[in-house]
């Protein structure tokens, strides 16, 4: 058997992996919300999510940021995403002041690995939480949501994790910034 014959299956596998890596990122959030998908860079050592482009766009458009940290293998994230989809008709008008940002993660990404970048500044998750005055400065919780102004200043303290704002009235309170 020739070397080329032995390597052919590996070449096919490599081509398939390369094709999958080249496909555009898809949001887990419903398309109706027009989410900006941010994939992590720096894997496998760290997962850095760069909010710079979303922040710049928010500044240009005079919008706030609704930043969603979800994990592809998180059942509670799937539940929240399904809730948003099922209630889109009622919720979408209240999302108008926001750009929705979907940070695509996985449950294997923990706090020591997760970094948030804004401009030239990249901070580990806990340091980022502390820098914005977020009381949730512990381990990464999926799903998590932050509401920011266009300067990445938090607009309110947010709940996180299971059962988080899964009713329309709760979601509307958050979008309206009612504490």
Sequence positions of predicted segments:
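Thiol-/selenol-based redox modules, centered on thioredoxin-like
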Residues: 155-179
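Hydrophobic beta-strand anchors of alpha/beta hydrolase catalytic cores
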Residues: 66-67, 145
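Thioredoxin-like thiol-disulfide oxidoreductase module
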Residues: 87-159
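A short beta-strand-turn-helix
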Residues: 46-65
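N-proximal helix/coil linker or "cap" segments that precede and/or mark the start of modular domains
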Residues: 23-44
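Bacterial N-terminal signal peptides
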Residues: 9-19
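Conserved redox-active cysteine motifs that mediate thiol-disulfide chemistry
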Residues: 71-83
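Bacterial N-terminal signal peptides that target proteins for export
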Residues: 1-11
């Amino acid at each position: 058997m020739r070397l080329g014959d032995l390597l052919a299956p590996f070449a096919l596998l490599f081509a398939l992996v390369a094709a999958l890596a080249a496909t555009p990122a898809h949001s887990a959030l419903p398309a109706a919300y027009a989410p900006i998908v941010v994939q992590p860079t720096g894997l496998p050592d760290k997962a850095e999510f760069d909010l710079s482009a979303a922040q710049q766009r928010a500044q240009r458009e005079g919008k706030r940021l609704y930043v969603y940290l979800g994990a592809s293998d998180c059942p509670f994230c799937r539940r929240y995403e399904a809730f948003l989809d099922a209630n889109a008709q009622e919720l979408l008008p209240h999302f108008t002041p926001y750009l929705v940002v979907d940070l695509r993660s996985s449950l294997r990404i923990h706090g020591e690995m997760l970094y948030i970048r804004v401009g030239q500044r990249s901070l580990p998750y806990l340091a980022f939480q502390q820098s914005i005055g977020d009381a949730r400065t512990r381990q990464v919780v999926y799903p998590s949501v932050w509401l920011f102004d266009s300067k990445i200043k938090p607009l309110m303290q947010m709940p996180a994790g299971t059962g988080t704002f899964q009713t329309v009235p709760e979601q509307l309170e958050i979008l309206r910034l009612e504490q």
